[in-house]
Amino acid sequence: MAAGPRTAKAALRRRIRRDLLPREYGGQGLPYEYQRAFDEESRCYEMPLILNTPTFTICCATLLDTAGEEQKKTHIGAALRGEEVLVQLLSEPSGGSDLAGVLTRAERRGDRWVIDGAKTWSTSAFAADYGLCLARTAWDVPKHEGLTMFLVPIDHPGITLRRITQVNGSSEFCEEFLDGVDVGEDAVVGEVNHGWAVASRQLYHERRAVGMGSEFASGGGSEGGHTTPVDYAELARQAGRADSDWVRETAGRALVHRAVAEQLIEHVYRSVSDGTLPPAGGTLIRLFHAETVMCEMDTALAIAGAAGVVGQPGEGLQAGLRYLARQSVAIGGGTTEMARNVIGERVLNFPREYAADRGVPFNQVRHGQAR
């Protein structure tokens, strides 16, 4: 079944939807096992990526943890009805992995907030209705203490959106320029100047989503087959290497990696739920997912050989096109290096890495060569 907005809305209207979300917000309030069963049964069907990630697995999950009751009823309910798509507006052109160092500013003017700045690498923002936008609202305090999260309408006239074309031809990411975007007090998620608490939960859900371990995902199918696991038997046949012992051995190693990744998702979910692991333990899924995908992409290209060479669109095997985006899996949802830091500091309780700007008011922190 082909995926798309109409397919998504039809599925949601027929109650093929997020089983775990509470009934008061439009979900079914069922145990995790129900969602897992649905995911298995729906694996052969496509599911629009933007509904799973970032709408439900990241944004709705974050609102469920941090938003006010009216925001939950309004936005989670609309998303479940297929009427609203939510995205993240977090990363910035100048920010790199330092999310707390955002430069997008929000100033209070009367009973309104006016937001100015730039965001980038926003997944599927071109199709979104609202974005969770992290902005700086206080500059004379350390960087983590002066942030506020806002729900911003993407169609606001002050937002200019551009799609980013990647090396593999995909244009799912966008960059946004915010100029005088005014929103009311009801757009604030959580508390003013306490947006890092909201962002931290958002990052937690993002890492689980990127690692394919979110309990709020619905359906195991991909959109357009772009994330469908590699069929090594078919790939070997297409490459003319179906009888190779080396191919069978190499593919077997990758499949073991895949099986371990699937079991890890279940183990980490249970361990975080019962308190055996801290919430940051979800980052284990994100890290191992990246290692698994890179292993599979390397294996697929090795099996494809010259048939994996990418020329014009539509030429060659899918293995080559996928390989072009290989490194992105080590960046999305926070870099692999950041994931290792989180695991070391918050799961294994290693000493924190030194940071020169810790405890320093943000307006006194050096940015490039400026102060």
Residue ranges and their predicted role:
Residues 112, 116-162:
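A short core secondary-structure module
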Residues 248-253, 280-287:
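Short, charged, amphipathic alpha-helical segments
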Residues 159-262, 329, 365-371:
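Glycine-rich beta->alpha junctions and the first turn(s) of the following alpha-helix
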